[in-house]
């Protein structure tokens, strides 16, 4: 148990999040009343693995101790619980049936994880465990992570999903410069879809429920064209735009969609110098491991593998690094 024990409302809040997920989908849980959540609390780690009638979650003690940690744990619960609809039963056509003996490529991973990631932000609010300001904060941070990933200019959402086996799950320190997560970019795409659908009197939840009725409930796999077929009667231009969002990098109209709901993202100035270097020790030598895109380090011509000899005539070695540490880039703030 965590120091001081679990929050008294934890079990009740988990139940409320599960009920909120059923409310979102408009149906009782397809797994019935025999669904098991296994939560493993670890020193470090975060994630979950969904099954037909259960899911295993991993969360860290340090994460739970953070200001927003409890809400993030409830979001993780909602994410995995929603997967009993979207993933376990409503699947891209390539996963009908699942083949656990090989890596199966599917662009539909963006829908499986991106849509779920978008809705998990709202489930604590729907459950009454959070408020709108917290949802706005979480959404701002999620969109910020996409905007601060240089790889979004290189890799499309469709490519990110299809290359998951060879890139996302074999990432390196330079991956952010050429790749983008289909979880995060998928969630940002879901946000844009939701805003555009709400502008014509519908919503992304309506789309998800519609696909559940037409495909998930009966075990039919869905294809990209099924999304277009659902969108065209409501907003023909949105169906075309979605094709563009999936196939082209860095075209998602995040700022326009935020403006449609009366919001914007304000960059927060860094409080310390930002050089953009990730350094490593190579037998006492100081070697560049990464020079972030658009950073002063990259602009000056530094690339991975370069050795830094001296700064201001001071010889560098691994024990003395007269460079300010690279601070985490702050998120944009919703306004």
Question: Where in the sequence are the language-model features?
Answer:
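Acidic/His/Gly-enriched intrinsically disordered linker/tail segments
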Residues: 90-98, 103-183, 213-218
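Soluble non-cytosolic domains of exported or imported proteins
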Residues: 4-16, 67-72, 76, 106, ...
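Juxtacatalytic substrate-recognition/specificity segment
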Residues: 1-109
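Acidic/polar loop patches that form or flank catalytic/metal-binding clefts of enzymes
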Residues: 30-33, 93-94, 126-137, 204, ...
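Generic, well-ordered alpha-helical scaffold segments in large soluble proteins
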Residues: 13-24, 60, 76, 80-84, ...
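Amphipathic alpha-helical substructures
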Residues: 165-258
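Beta/coil-rich, acidic/histidine-enriched accessory regions frequently appended to metallopeptidases
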Residues: 216-335
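Acidic/histidine-enriched alpha-helical segments
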Residues: 33-40, 136-140, 208-209
């Amino acid at each position: 148990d965590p120091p001081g024990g679990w929050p008294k409302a934890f079990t009740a809040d988990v139940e409320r999040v599960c009920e909120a997920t059923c409310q979102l989908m408009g149906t009782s849980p397809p797994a019935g009343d025999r669904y098991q959540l296994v939560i493993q609390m670890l020193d470090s780690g975060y994630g979950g693995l969904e099954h037909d009638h259960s899911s295993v979650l991993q969360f860290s003690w340090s994460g739970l101790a953070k200001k927003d940690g409890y809400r993030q744990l409830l979001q993780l619960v909602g994410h995995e619980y929603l997967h009993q609809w979207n993933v376990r039963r409503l699947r891209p056509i390539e996963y009908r049936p699942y083949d656990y003996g090989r890596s199966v490529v599917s662009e539909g991973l963006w829908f499986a994880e991106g849509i779920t990631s978008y809705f998990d932000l709202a489930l604590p609010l729907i459950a009454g465990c959070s408020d709108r300001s917290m949802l706005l904060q979480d959404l701002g941070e999620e969109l910020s992570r996409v905007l601060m990933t240089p790889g979004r200019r290189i890799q499309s959402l469709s490519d990110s999903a299809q290359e998951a086996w060879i890139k996302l799950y074999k990432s390196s320190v330079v991956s952010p410069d050429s790749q983008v997560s289909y979880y995060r970019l998928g969630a940002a795409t879901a946000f844009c879809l939701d805003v555009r659908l709400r502008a014509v009197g519908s919503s992304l939840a309506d789309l998800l429920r519609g696909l559940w009725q037409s495909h998930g409930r009966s075990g039919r796999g869905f294809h990209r064209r099924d999304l277009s077929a659902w969108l065209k009667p409501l907003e023909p231009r949105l169906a075309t735009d979605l094709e563009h969002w999936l196939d082209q990098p860095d075209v998602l109209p995040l700022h326009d969609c935020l403006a449609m709901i009366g919001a914007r993202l304000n960059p927060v100035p860094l409080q310390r110098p930002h050089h953009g270097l990730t350094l490593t020790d190579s037998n006492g030598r100081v070697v560049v491991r990464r020079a972030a895109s658009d950073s002063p380090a990259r602009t000056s011509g530094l690339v991975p593998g370069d050795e830094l000899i001296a700064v201001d005539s001071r010889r560098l070695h691994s024990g003395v690094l007269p460079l300010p540490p690279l601070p985490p880039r702050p998120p944009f703030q919703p306004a």
